[in-house]
Amino acid sequence: MEKEEKKEEWIKQLKENLINPPKIKADITIEEEKKIILEKTAEVYTEHDLWKKLKKSKQTKKPLIIKYGIDPTSSGFHLGHFVFLRQLKKIQDLGHQIIFLIGDFTARIGDPSDKKAARQPLTKAQVEQNMKNYFSIVSRYIKFGEDGKKAKLAYNSRWLSKLNLEKFFPLTSTLTVSQMLERDCFSRRFKDNKPIGVNEFLYPLLQGYDSVALKADVEIGGRDQTFNMLV
């Protein structure tokens, strides 16, 4: 019970920070900006690359495109989602362009990351309902609109549903089966003689293609997404 109370209190504080975030001064340096972006970040690939992108952004006065993707595989948000929302809010306040990507196409495949078994496929209707629930929560804290200072909402079905074999097959040569089997989620299932779907092998390629389609400068995600984000 005490653990649940602490969790609820933490979520309450996160929401308060989202509604009333700390003020960011106007004349912020690149190093200070990088520090804000990397606050509470476990890993970054690479810090020097981020610094170079921030420097170029400041010189050209062109905001970075920051991608945060989420597959609507459930009906609600968990604690980790609110942590990312807080970070995205800070980055938006720094003046960068947030793209909140809804994986309405990939949700029907299922991300295998950190899973001991294949996900149950969702229907299009389930995905659409989950999408509505997600956006109703996110839009309370993140400002959306066509204004460059506001976040944009994107759906990966817009390009992935049009991706034909002629374009997709060359992408498959960038990964090997041995690389995929090095992932914990796959190696455990392979050793336990549990099924691994070919569609699950293809998932990281689709996530990587999302970043290309959005021309993202930076992608934010959980540690379980590291392999997918580096593809």
Predicted segments, located by residue:
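Non-catalytic terminal extensions that flank enzyme cores
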Residues: 1-72
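Short amphipathic alpha-helical segments, especially helix-boundary/capping motifs
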Residues: 24-28, 61-65, 111-112, 179-180, ...
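Short charge-dense sequence patches
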Residues: 27-40, 75-90, 150-158, 178-188
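Divalent-metal (Mg2+/Mn2+/Ca2+)-assisted nucleotide/phosphate chemistry catalytic cores
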Residues: 41, 121-131, 135-231
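Short, well-ordered alpha-helical scaffold segments within catalytic/effector domains
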Residues: 47, 51, 85, 199-202, ...
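N-terminal catalytic cores of NTP/NDP-binding nucleotidyl/phosphoryl-transfer enzymes
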Residues: 50-112, 220-226
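A glycine- and small-aliphatic-rich helix-loop capping segment at beta-alpha/alpha-beta transitions
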Residues: 84, 117-119, 171
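Active-site rim/loop-helix segments in enzyme catalytic domains that contact anionic ligands
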Residues: 89, 100-138
